[in-house]
């Protein structure tokens, strides 16, 4: 099993277990909020499966139909996870508004509160693990899935607050908290979607990246100038094209060696997948 798949498998198993526990306890004690939160957890299994499919497709080597590889697929699937987060925000907000309109009175006990706390703790641990591995491997799917876990933890916080407020006779505080959390989740969803739209559409990296490329190329022996640097995202990785200037008194072999040296130096940089180097002779 590849390292990037482990957190996604953990997501599936964790969400199934948490979802079933919350649904069962919610059904036994007639808690609509716990049942809804449980269904929310089970729905996350779908996004984790989407993530696994995306990672598997993205890891395929280049072929005739995709000569630059399949890394954009990872961003496409991450975008879908962002859309799922938007839907989650909508559902939580809708649930909160309905609670304000209709109200809900149930008998709250320690088991219900304990399940909500368990969900918060487990989901936060899953968030930190997925985020750690995602940043380590620069996997947009894992990073998106991590923030999805965080949204689940926040929705469980809403449930916990709602249960506690209900316990003490305050029936609308939890709904206000739910609306706030829904807006927070929507913001995360927006960031995920925007980031991956940039990756999918081949957006150029920041200006400081181009400065780094020029600096690294000039550090190669006999490179006396650099111009026409172009770079764009191919999925979460970067492809670079540039012209390097060399003196006219060098041999063809030296020109080739310089081209290879610049290419290898640039491709050793973080997130640079490919570098295309053109060697220009200057008098």
Curated annotation (Swiss-Prot):
InterPro entries: Cation_efflux, Cation_efflux_CTD, Cation_efflux_CTD_sf, Cation_efflux_TMD_sf, CDF_Transporter. Its main location: membrane. It is found in: Cell membrane. The keyword Nucleotidyltransferase does not apply. Keywords: Cell membrane, Membrane, Transmembrane, Transmembrane helix, Transport. GO terms for molecular function: monoatomic cation transmembrane transporter activity. It is a multi-pass membrane protein. The keyword Glycosyltransferase does not apply. Belongs to the cation diffusion facilitator (CDF) transporter (TC 2.A.4) family. This is Uncharacterized transporter MJ0449.
